[in-house]
Amino acid sequence: MVKPLGEGTRDVSNVGCKSVDLLLASLGGLAAAVAAAYAGELLLRRRKLDQGASMGYKDVKIAPLIERKDSGRRSNLERFSHYVARQLGFEDPNEYPQLCKLANGYLLKTKGYDENVDEYLENEAERDSLYVHLLEEFDRCILTYFSFNWTQSSNLISQALSDESDQKVPKLKDFVMAATRKQRFERVTKDLKVKRVISTLVEEMRVIGSGSSEPHCTEVMSPVAHNKRSPVLLLMGGGMGAGKSTVLKDIFLESFWSEAQADAVVIEADAFKETDVIYRALSSRGHHDDMLQTAELVHQSSTDAASSLLVTALNDGRDVIMDGTLSWEPFVEQMIEMARNVHKQKYRMGEGYKVSEEGTITEKYWEEEEEETKENGKQQNLKPYRIELVGVVCDAYLAVARGIRRALMVKRAVRVKPQLNSHKRFANAFPKYCELVDNARLYCTNAVGGPPRLIAWKDGNSKLLVDPEDIDCLKRVSSLNPDAESIYELYPDPSQLSKPGSVWNDVVLVPSRPKVQKELSDAIRRIEKAQPKN
């Protein structure tokens, strides 16, 4: 059917008007998008300029480059190997493939990485010194590379663990995995719920020693031995990545713990994460982008398992080493109170952290058992616990770098903000904890490649004695900004990073570095030039 001329003409006119409107709207939207992008870029540049001004323009180039992507696509960070090449003065990292391979191998500590570096330099006259300088430069680059872009730590980890070709074009698989993460996690959690309960119980029995076919009580920790001495609760505290494991190794060499260690109960929430059946099931699938979420999924269950093991060990009068951040004051205070009274009254798990419908918060992590103390003769034979505290602090940017590198190697990661919060909270709480314990020590692990330094100590009722210079580390950490995106935003006064004694100043900004970099770059050019081309 043919439409009347007037109606058809009117329709064409309306379509034309609509087309013009759509065109104008599109142009307006495009202009707005361009303006927003430009404003965002200006803000980014201004932020970088402000950071550069606070630190000095000489080290602005230290920050990794970021390749901006279209809206909805994550940005690509400069790859670590390319970053190393740029720090050594090479404009095109693709011209130095062997160097890039060595840098990645060192970052991930792949098998034989040190032998590969030695082989790479074998024809150089100054082979030994170049070997040392190259590894030192790798270490500097690891520290500086991980001192920026903290909100993109998940992207950074995934990129480091993926092939370079995988980063050029985002795969459909990546989008699908991200979109289905919640459903996948829920399915695995549901399927393994019962198995997890049994597995966690078995793990607790293994750690406590009850599952052994031989009696687990020895002269060191049995109630008979406690007639001669009190059992010991050692609290190892410090932010994530502070270096607690390093300090604990030294403590195990001390006369008391060298004998008591074998029968002591060592409690660490992270250890329960690694044995959690749900965590292992998800981690075994090798999805790098799931790493942070997987650790977060089992965080509460691993914390509960550690708390359950703690109360069991204290009820038995065992020597206990509690290894954790100790960053949540109510939890630590209740733990110490329980340890003070457990020789008189047994305890059990409490309800934990609860928020009522009205918004009221209650925290009850442990509670006394209902039965009378007199009914338990064994409990009356125990001596009061001696409670010792060993704290570990370091500049938080060092801990972030350690944490991300550890994530690359053990495939277990944490977000940077909670990590920074754990450092700040522990630093603020440490003086309060010292008043609640019988003995306290504080170590600083800022020395790169060096041993931990004892910077504060307290024994008995004495006041906390401190090293007046080194205690500044605790003060800095107590005032850090947990929302920092980079090292430049970490402390209220960024200029302290460039002062003598600062790791950043003494390791990264060391005056001899440009000369060493020149020697390395000259040698690398010779070596790469002599390499056969593919």
From Swiss-Prot:
An annotated GO cellular component: mitochondrial outer membrane
Swiss-Prot/TrEMBL cofactor(s): Ca(2+)
Record membrane topology: Peripheral membrane protein
NAD is among the record's keywords: no
Keyword set, alphabetical order: ATP-binding, Calmodulin-binding, Kinase, Membrane, Mitochondrion, Mitochondrion outer membrane, Nucleotide-binding, Transferase
GO biological process: NADP biosynthetic process
Subcellular location: Mitochondrion outer membrane
InterPro entries referenced in this protein's UniProt entry, alphabetically: NADKc-like (IPR044802), P-loop_NTPase (IPR027417), Zeta_toxin_domain (IPR010488)
Residue ranges of the region described as Calmodulin-binding: 167-196
Knocked-out gene: effects: No visible phenotype under normal growth conditions.
Record keyword Mitochondrion present: yes
Enzyme Commission identifier(s): 2.7.1.23
Reaction(s) the record says it catalyses: NAD(+) + ATP = ADP + NADP(+) + H(+)
Binding site for ATP: G238, G239, M240, G241, A242, G243, K244, S245
GO molecular function: ATP binding; calmodulin binding; NAD+ kinase activity
Known role: Phosphorylates NAD(+) to produce NADP(+) in a calmodulin calcium-dependent manner. Does not possess activity toward NADH. Has broad specificity for the phosphoryl donor, as ATP, CTP, GTP and UTP can be used interchangeably and produce similar efficiencies. May play a role in producing NADP(H) needed to regulate the elicitor-induced reactive oxygen species (ROS) burst by sustaining the activity of NADPH oxidases. Does not seem to play a role in photosynthesis-driven growth.
Protein name (Swiss-Prot/TrEMBL): Calmodulin calcium-dependent NAD kinase
Lineage, top ranks: Eukaryota, Viridiplantae, Streptophyta, Embryophyta, Tracheophyta
